[in-house]
Every structure is written in C-alpha cells, then in structure tokens.
Amino acid sequence: MRVFHYARDRWIERITNDGFLKLTGVEAVPGVQPSLLPGLVWLTKLEQVPHTCSYPPEGMIQYVFDSDNPKIQHWPLVKKKIMAGVTGYVLNKYKVSKKWNVHPDRLAPASAMAEGLDKYAVEAGDDPDDFYVSLKRLSPTDCLEMNETPERIQAQARGEMVQVEDKITREIYITYRPIVAGGDVES
C-alpha cells in the first residue's frame, strides 16, 4: 500500500511502521536535491518521486488540484470541489501535529461528509482550515492489499460507500459513490 502525503507550509511528519521516512520543515527527500522539490512531493514506502504536474504518473495517487495553484490543495478548496460534486475519491484530513478520523458509523454522501468533517474538527477544538487533505482512489485491489473483507470489496466494486482501514498504516479512508457524469474527473 503506497502512502502519499503533503502539507501546505511544511512537510507533514510521517513515520511509517517500518520507519521508512520522516520529513519535517524543508528537509529534502533522501536522494533528491532540495532545488528539485517543487513544493509538493509524492511519498511512498518504496520510492520518492518529486512531481511538478497537476496529475501524477499512472498508478499513483491523484489529488484534486486548484487550477491556479497546482502544487497545493488546502482543505477549503477541496471542500468546495467536493460540494460541487467532485467525488469518488478517498478523503483523509491531516494536521501537522495530529490526525483524527471520522467515526465509521457516520458515513454520508460526499457533500454531507465535507460539512461533517468541519463539524467534527470544531468539536475536537481544532480549526478545520488547519487540516491538510490527501485524496486517493481505491480499487478492489487496494482493499485486498489491506486485508479487507469480501463484503466490503464487493461493496466497493458496486460503487457504494466503504470505510476501509489500512492494516499497514492504521489510517482510515472514506470512499464516496461517484456522482460525476462520465466517471472520473481528470481536469
């Protein structure tokens, strides 16, 4: 399971279970010169790929970018796109210093989830706009890699909402039913 993160003002500190990476401030990815970092870097357990385009290579996580600033996508912009119907992605919310997850019993359509995440953040004493967002598409293969149950894999294949726990990183991913005509949004 590849794991990708980014932050607006600094790298999110991230230590995988195998202790593979830990990035804070403006530290460079191992083996990558700082001058090559565009302000956004795609991180995986297996490799580090600096990336300057709006969309990553095939098979990597795809973020929803703001056309005026393809390097960064902060929560208010992501929420705006979700409310506009850009769904079918996995939504994670991160803070530099902490992480919290939506309770699995609170699954809802994407627009309601976008509003709900703000509500939960406020209830936890956090400013929703302090959170950073990663968006990932899930496939039945991803579910298999995460030791998901056949029932959830089948639900994912039907396009239904599924709450998935990554057994490797212990993160919660929330997937939504795609509602955009024509399938995936690429622009």
What residue spans do the PLM features occupy?
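A broad, structure-centric signal for solvent-exposed, well-ordered loop/edge residues
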Residues: 10-14, 22, 50-51, 103, ...
